[in-house]
Amino acid sequence: MVLVAYRHGLRATELVALRWDSVDFNHGRLHVNRAKSGSPSVHPLSGRELRALRRLQREQEPKSPFVFTSERGAPFSAAGWRKMVARLGVAAGFDVLVHPHMLRHACGYKLANDGIDTRSLQAYLGHKNIQHTVRYTELAPTRFKDFWRD
């Protein structure tokens, strides 16, 4: 769950709503329905993600149309996901309360630091308003890398 949430910058509600028919194993794609913008997007899945998702699907008991389920087989809830992330933060020894949206922010900052342009990042994260995306690029040191070419 952590890997998928981070790699795709998913909101808690988007993550727990993922269904197996959203995962295109043949083409290595994840179909994401963005909660706030309502716009669907298609993200590439890494080989690591595909392997983890295949294993999860194979081992999921009882079978469910939802990708992430509780131990009882019910769809994972956003509240359950928040509690899980908070517990992981405590177990990791973080001094702050860890919440799932931190994974979304980490995705945004990582992609901005890698030099992904603001419009592409906006589309990837599903932001309607570009101002929500600009926060990631404002702090990215790579934004100045091509200013001077010597």
Where are these regions (language model features)?
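Conserved tyrosine-mediated DNA breakage-rejoining catalytic core shared by Y-recombinases
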Residues: 8, 17-55
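Active-site/catalytic core of tyrosine-dependent DNA strand-transfer enzymes
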Residues: 46-95
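Catalytic tyrosine of NAD(P)H-dependent dehydrogenase/reductases that use a Tyr as the general acid/base
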Residues: 97-101, 136
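Alpha-helix N-cap/helix-start motif at helix boundaries, enriched for small hydrophobics
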Residues: 1-2, 9, 13-18, 121
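C-terminal catalytic core of tyrosine-transesterase DNA break-rejoin enzymes
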Residues: 3, 7, 87, 104-128, ...
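Short coil/turn motifs that cap or connect alpha-helices
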Residues: 11, 19-21, 128-131
